[in-house]
Amino acid sequence: GTVNKIFSGETCLKIDTYEKLKNALTEQKEQLNNRGTVKVGAVNFDIKLADVNENLTRVKNKLLECNAKGVSVVVFSELCLTGYTMSDLFYQSALLSSVENALQELKFFSKSVNCIFFVGSPLRVNGKIYNCSVAFCNGKILGINVKNYLPDYNEFYEARVFCPCPQENFYVDFLGEKVLFGNKIVYKNSLFPSMKIGVEICEDLWVAIPPSTVQALNGATICCNLSASDEVIGKAEYRRQIVSTQSAKNFCAYVYSDACYGESTTDLVFAGHNIIAENGKILNQTELFSGKDAIAEVDVEFLEHERSRFFKYSFNVPKCDEVEFDLKTSNFAPERKYDKTP
């Protein structure tokens, strides 16, 4: 009734009140335009091993690029602040201190971009070194996800350096905040409750019961993977299949960010195979060695709809801690194509 009176001229409004009403109606229209969809990105860059400051600059540049494209969830590759193939350099206190300084800078930088993003870094906690993903949004560190499954077969020897994720989450004092530390964490957007995010790291996906399965059963509709997966014959196709399958059986979107060729300085080759899948369908993936990012629109409300149809069973899985954040997802012109006869 009030709106009708305003437009009929029966009621006068102050200019600032009119502007507030206009902005509210515009915001509602934007939400309707992108209802249920979120733009996500699996991104990487040419990493400079042990050069934390240079890698920090490249992370910032990528975030600005994604922000300009309306990407709301940005996933970087495993250990991207230092590089994955660092071997004994991970023990160096100077390197670990540089990482903390870079994370502090990213904490403040996160105020200038409209997204939640995940950055891979080594962290020393209680005297142990962990392979971690740090979540940022709106000037806050939301949580620290820890890699649980550390490969020590064939060309891998991560268990020599890193400790596996503790069995239970706990809080750590980190950069002036109490931050949740573990892998049973789901990040929930309080402004868009269907947008719930789980995180795992590389090898965690390749085991019988990945952390992302536990996170999905605790409500995560978007699962992110920070990876450094090297190339051998036939591995790219297997990687594509495992990402697709994980998204299908958990009715989730899966955002897989893979380390790029900057890691190829030892006896391993990395190609930056970024993949985004939704409910078994590959929405976007990059060509090997292209150095490009994968960006796609995922329909989280569709995923929740599918789960309500098929998730009829009871699973005995651990409970995840829920961390809330406030993010107004970016408005964008939809580009996703749908089959007329699916």
Language-model-detected regions and their locations in the chain:
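Recognition helix of helix-turn-helix/homeodomain-like DNA-binding domains
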Residues: 1-13
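DNA major-groove recognition helix of helix-turn-helix/homeodomain DNA-binding modules
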Residues: 15-30
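Enzyme catalytic cores with a strong preference for nitrogen-chemistry domains
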Residues: 32-342
